[in-house]
């Protein structure tokens, strides 16, 4: 595990998991990597949340279906729901957005307010709730409370995840600038480029 963008693994990789605190930019990075390496991006939130935010019964079957394909990138989440046990053995690269709390917090506030104001559809007809929900202390009802509750999850969980999955290459990115520099270095590295 190295920190300098020039010394980080450059790939390309065929199956990628992106870990990080809620709001850190996992989905945004997944889209960027999908474009850089010609991978299929499957957003786990779209598989998990059915209409009216009800969890879909077919979630794990859907995860297993796309995980069995050869080329994908997705967010490393829903591990407590069983997705980790399906995705981790197949993945080749784990990218960990280990950003400072204030960076992820600012990004999540901006994203939540924007989604709430625009009422943009997220997944399966669902939309961000009222901004008044941000005053609720229940992490199941307030994404900011959820972020606070889970803020140390990856720092606690990553060592065990890597021990369970010694085949994974890890790229740990500690700032958006470091992420941008790493992604910029991927330009021109197609799926057929030498690794």
Model-identified regions with their sequence ranges:
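Hydrophobic positions on the alpha1 helix immediately C-terminal to the Walker A/P-loop
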Residues: 29
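The conserved Walker
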Residues: 22
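A glycine- and Lys/Arg-enriched "phosphate-lid" helix/loop adjacent to the NTP-binding pocket
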Residues: 99-153, 192-194
């Amino acid at each position: 595990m190295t920190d300098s963008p020039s010394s980080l693994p450059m790939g390309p990789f065929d199956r990628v998991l992106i870990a990080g605190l809620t709001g850190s930019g996992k989905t945004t990075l997944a889209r960027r990597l999908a474009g850089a390496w010609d991978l299929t991006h499957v957003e786990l939130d779209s598989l998990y949340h059915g209409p009216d935010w009800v969890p879909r019964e077919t979630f794990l079957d859907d995860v297993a279906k796309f995980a069995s394909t050869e080329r994908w990138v997705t967010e490393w989440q829903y591990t407590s729901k069983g997705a980790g046990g399906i995705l981790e053995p197949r993945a080749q690269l784990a990218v960990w957005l280990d950003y400072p709390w204030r960076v992820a917090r600012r990004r999540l506030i901006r994203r939540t307010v924007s989604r709430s104001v625009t009422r943009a559809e997220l997944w399966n007809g669902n939309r961000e709730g009222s901004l008044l929900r941000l005053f609720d202390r229940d992490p199941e009802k307030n994404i900011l409370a959820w972020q606070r509750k889970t803020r140390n999850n990856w720092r606690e969980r990553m060592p065990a995840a890597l021990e369970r999955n010694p085949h994974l290459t890890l790229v740990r990115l500690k700032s958006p600038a470091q992420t941008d520099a790493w992604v910029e270095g991927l330009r021109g590295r197609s799926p057929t480029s030498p690794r």
